Design a protein with these regions (language model features):
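N-terminal beta-strand motif that seeds the catalytic metal site of vicinal oxygen chelate
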Residues: 2-37, 99-106, 165-170
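N-terminal strand-loop-strand beta-hairpin
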Residues: 3-5, 12-13, 22-28, 43-69
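Amphipathic alpha-helical segments
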Residues: 32-48, 116-124
Length: 170
C-alpha cells in the first residue's frame, strides 16, 4: 500500500520522552470479546484476528484478539479472575457490553532503550503496574495518568517478532 503522507521513521529515544518509540499498537478492553470482535468485523472492516490467550500471572484468564491495519495493530482484550484488574478496572461495572481504550503499544529495539524507558518512567514518578519477561517479549505497562490510559512497551524476542508477523493483515 502506498501512503499519501510521508511518514518518518520513529525517533526512538525513550530517555527524551516516553512517546519517542515505535508506536505500533492500539488496544481496547471489553466486557464481551465476541461482541467486540463482531463490532470490528461488521462496522470497522477488520474481519480476521489472531487469538492469544492463557493464564495471568496471578491466576486469572486473559484473551486477546489481534489484527493489523497498515502499520497499526489493533488489540481487543478481555480478562477475568485474579490479576484481571489491570485490564478491566477502567470499564463501567454492571452495564452490559462496554469497550474502552486501554493502551498504546510501543516497540523498543534494544536493552539500552528498555533501560532508558524504565529510568524515564521512574524520574516522572509514574508507576509500572505490570512487568513480565516471557518467551515472546519482555513487556511492561506504564500508567500515564494524565493521558487516562497505559503505555505498553515491548522488547521483542525473535519468537515475538515471528508471532506479530503472523497476525492477520487487512
Amino acid at each position: 500500500m502506498h501512503y499519501l503522507l510521508q511518514r518518518p521513521a520513529a525517533s526512538v529515544d525513550p530517555d527524551a520522552g516516553l512517546l519517542l518509540a515505535e508506536h505500533f499498537q492500539m488496544a481496547y478492553v471489553t466486557t464481551d470479546i465476541e461482541r467486540a470482535c463482531e463490532l470490528f468485523r461488521s462496522r470497522l472492516g477488520i474481519r480476521r484476528f489472531a487469538r492469544l490467550e492463557g493464564q495471568l500471572v496471578a491466576g486469572g484468564h486473559i484473551r486477546t484478539e489481534l489484527a493489523w491495519v497498515g502499520s497499526i495493530m489493533y488489540e481487543l482484550i478481555s480478562a477475568s479472575g485474579p490479576g484481571s484488574e489491570l485490564y478491566m478496572a477502567r470499564l463501567p461495572q454492571g452495564q452490559g457490553f462496554a469497550m474502552r481504550h486501554h493502551h498504546l503499544g510501543f516497540l523498543l529495539q534494544s536493552r539500552q532503550q528498555w533501560d532508558a524507558m524504565i529510568a524515564k518512567t521512574m524520574r516522572l514518578g509514574w508507576s509500572i503496574p505490570y512487568r513480565n519477561d516471557n518467551p515472546l517479549v519482555e513487556v511492561c505497562f506504564v500508567d500515564a495518568p494524565e493521558l487516562g490510559h497505559y503505555l505498553e512497551y515491548f522488547l521483542p524476542k525473535q519468537a515475538g517478532l515471528d508471532f506479530f508477523n503472523g497476525v492477520p493483515r487487512h
